[in-house]
Amino acid sequence: MENQLAKSTEERTFQYQDSLPSLPVPSLEESLKKYLESVKPFANEEEYKNTEAIVWKFQNGIGEKLQQKLLQRAKGRRNWLEEWWLNVAYLDVRIPSQLNVNFGGPASHIEHYWPPKEGTQLERGSISLWHNLNYWQLLRKEKLAVEKVGNTPLDMNQFRMLFSTCKIPGITRDSIINYFRTESEGHSPSHLAVLCRGRVFVFDVMHEGYLMTAPEIQRQLTYIQKKCHSEPDGPGVAALTTEERTRWAKAREYLISLNPENLTILEKIQSSLLVFCLDDDSPHVTPEDYSQVSAKILNGDPTVRWGDKSYNLIAFSNGVFGSNCDHAPFDAMVLVKVCYYVDENILENEGRWKGSEKVRDIPVPEELVFTVDEKVLNDINQAKAQYFKQVSDLQLVVYAFTSFGKKLTKEKQLHPDTFIQLALQLAYYRLHGRPGCCYETAMTRLFYHGRTETVRPCTVEAVNWCQSMQNPSTSLLERKHMMLEAFAKHNKMMKDCSTGKGFDRHLLGLSLIAKEEGLPVPELFTDPLFSRSGGGGNFVLSTSLVGYLRVQGVMVPMVHNGYGFFYHIRDDRFVVSCSAWKSCPETDAEKLVQQVFHAFCDMMQLMEMPHL
């Protein structure tokens, strides 16, 4: 073990980036075969035959030409998907991204040394910030261990995007600006932005070449809070980041035209390490029920979140914490890693600051005061109005299932992630009486700048098993057999998707090549079964495993009649979050989660069946 630790400090965080394999282009025939299999649960015989004919025509016609063009594209770049994915999945999207695209999550400090307690916001906030800043320094020094699967390194590029990164709204397409540099690359910004009661402050976290201590950070936060609590609220320019993207882009251009100083202020916020949000709310939270705090993280006060920042760290009045992140620059596992690092350090230090109490003579924080006029104030009010309207429609529950967890599923030789996915399939089937097309995230970080691929858990095998569970004449043994077949299928799909053999991103690539070539949209993509099975961003169940650490995530559904279902796995429990829109009469997040918990028990009961 000692050797391993010594070795890990010698490895630099980004040292393998140049030697990672390029993202492969899968075989056309294989992808189409997998696609056909995935639409089966949503088609009758006639519809399936029709789609089969469309696929065959595509494979032997335009599909082959598009595949050749895609292979050409892949020759010239190490990741043929990267730029496309960023644009299509994030930067071209015009709907407000803060609520619809961002992800968030509550900190689990409440489970040990930091239960909710009024009057602790600033002291705890400064300790949490200090650990976050240590993580930033590890990244700058490239001392963060390279993540690996076995001995194979994973792409670490997304970790460059955690700090000093921001999305900039554009009229038709947004852009991402990243100011972070490692120490060997040169200067990197070292200031924090703090939002409080509609006002914006910044201060440098380095003083005379050293990182501020937690008591020094606390002094800065106290100065800001006292000032904000004894003076009128600011205009809340941050609320503009909740707006529809083109609207926000125009409002931003107008803001800059009012006074060039406004651009300087925007750039200071954009380049800040992270945005620390002092929130006056005191949401309820327990280790078994994170619903209220999670909702506030996703849909809280828009004047104290900068929706375009890659990292908003939120401190509530009762000393409870959470994060809200723009999804464009990175996927949730980056946030999971920093949150876990901070939580472990808080745990190790019993929630206290154990360093020096000395506070150096440090310049007070600088307030950034925007020049605003009637039009800007109107824009802010309009942004808030549309934000609160959508926010009031969100239903979100986050509960812990504590009867068992990973330990028991492993004992039964069941993959815990697959266990939850199949429970969700059964729960949806029981609640809605039909199969639910489902998106589960697989990671493709084995490849250069790899991000994600789609696993489609609603397989023929899963549906057959769900039907057997609802059919009183099917024996328990048959049900168990069918369940294990569904497990095997899911595990194989996950393996394929993680190793570059998925088909969703491949089909996206083929459709984008057609678009770039000015060709008509191939029939494959206009076939009703394409969208009914989830294609084109139509998955009714949008899901992801957040990991095996004490970190939970939340996101809104992908479609109006769908659910956002995110979960993490521990030895003794499964923690799940489920979101839905109240204005959709057929969805109910609370009921779905109860059905999932019910399914967990039913599945475990099947495993108690002796092998005959």
UniProtKB/Swiss-Prot annotation:
<feature type="binding site">
    <location>
        <begin position="410"/>
        <end position="417"/>
    </location>
    <ligand>
        <name>CoA</name>
    </ligand>
</feature>
<comment type="similarity">
    <text>Belongs to the carnitine/choline acetyltransferase family.</text>
</comment>
<comment type="pathway">
    <text>Lipid metabolism; fatty acid beta-oxidation.</text>
</comment>
<keyword id="KW-0007">Acetylation</keyword>
<dbReference type="GO" id="GO:0051791">
    <property type="term" value="P:medium-chain fatty acid metabolic process"/>
</dbReference>
<keyword id="KW-0012">Acyltransferase</keyword>
<dbReference type="InterPro" id="IPR039551">
    <property type="entry name" value="Cho/carn_acyl_trans"/>
</dbReference>
<dbReference type="GO" id="GO:0005777">
    <property type="term" value="C:peroxisome"/>
</dbReference>
<feature type="modified residue" description="N6-succinyllysine; alternate">
    <location>
        <position position="406"/>
    </location>
</feature>
<feature type="active site" description="Proton acceptor">
    <location>
        <position position="327"/>
    </location>
</feature>
<dbReference type="InterPro" id="IPR000542">
    <property type="entry name" value="Carn_acyl_trans"/>
</dbReference>
<feature type="binding site">
    <location>
        <position position="406"/>
    </location>
    <ligand>
        <name>CoA</name>
    </ligand>
</feature>
<feature type="modified residue" description="N6-succinyllysine">
    <location>
        <position position="57"/>
    </location>
</feature>
<keyword id="KW-0276">Fatty acid metabolism</keyword>
<keyword id="KW-0813">Transport</keyword>
<dbReference type="GO" id="GO:0009437">
    <property type="term" value="P:carnitine metabolic process"/>
</dbReference>
<dbReference type="GO" id="GO:0006635">
    <property type="term" value="P:fatty acid beta-oxidation"/>
</dbReference>
<dbReference type="GO" id="GO:0008458">
    <property type="term" value="F:carnitine O-octanoyltransferase activity"/>
</dbReference>
<dbReference type="GO" id="GO:0006091">
    <property type="term" value="P:generation of precursor metabolites and energy"/>
</dbReference>
<keyword id="KW-0808">Transferase</keyword>
<dbReference type="InterPro" id="IPR023213">
    <property type="entry name" value="CAT-like_dom_sf"/>
</dbReference>
<feature type="modified residue" description="N6-succinyllysine">
    <location>
        <position position="40"/>
    </location>
</feature>
<dbReference type="InterPro" id="IPR042572">
    <property type="entry name" value="Carn_acyl_trans_N"/>
</dbReference>
<keyword id="KW-0576">Peroxisome</keyword>
<feature type="binding site">
    <location>
        <position position="452"/>
    </location>
    <ligand>
        <name>(R)-carnitine</name>
    </ligand>
</feature>
<feature type="short sequence motif" description="Microbody targeting signal">
    <location>
        <begin position="610"/>
        <end position="612"/>
    </location>
</feature>
<comment type="subunit">
    <text>Monomer.</text>
</comment>
<comment type="function">
    <text>Beta-oxidation of fatty acids. The highest activity concerns the C6 to C10 chain length substrate.</text>
</comment>
<dbReference type="GO" id="GO:0006631">
    <property type="term" value="P:fatty acid metabolic process"/>
</dbReference>
<feature type="modified residue" description="N-acetylmethionine">
    <location>
        <position position="1"/>
    </location>
</feature>
<feature type="binding site">
    <location>
        <position position="441"/>
    </location>
    <ligand>
        <name>(R)-carnitine</name>
    </ligand>
</feature>
<protein>
    <recommendedName>
        <fullName>Peroxisomal carnitine O-octanoyltransferase</fullName>
        <ecNumber>2.3.1.137</ecNumber>
    </recommendedName>
</protein>
<dbReference type="InterPro" id="IPR042231">
    <property type="entry name" value="Cho/carn_acyl_trans_2"/>
</dbReference>
<dbReference type="Pfam" id="PF00755">
    <property type="entry name" value="Carn_acyltransf"/>
</dbReference>
<dbReference type="GO" id="GO:0015936">
    <property type="term" value="P:coenzyme A metabolic process"/>
</dbReference>
<keyword id="KW-0443">Lipid metabolism</keyword>
<feature type="binding site">
    <location>
        <position position="439"/>
    </location>
    <ligand>
        <name>(R)-carnitine</name>
    </ligand>
</feature>
<feature type="modified residue" description="N6-acetyllysine; alternate">
    <location>
        <position position="406"/>
    </location>
</feature>
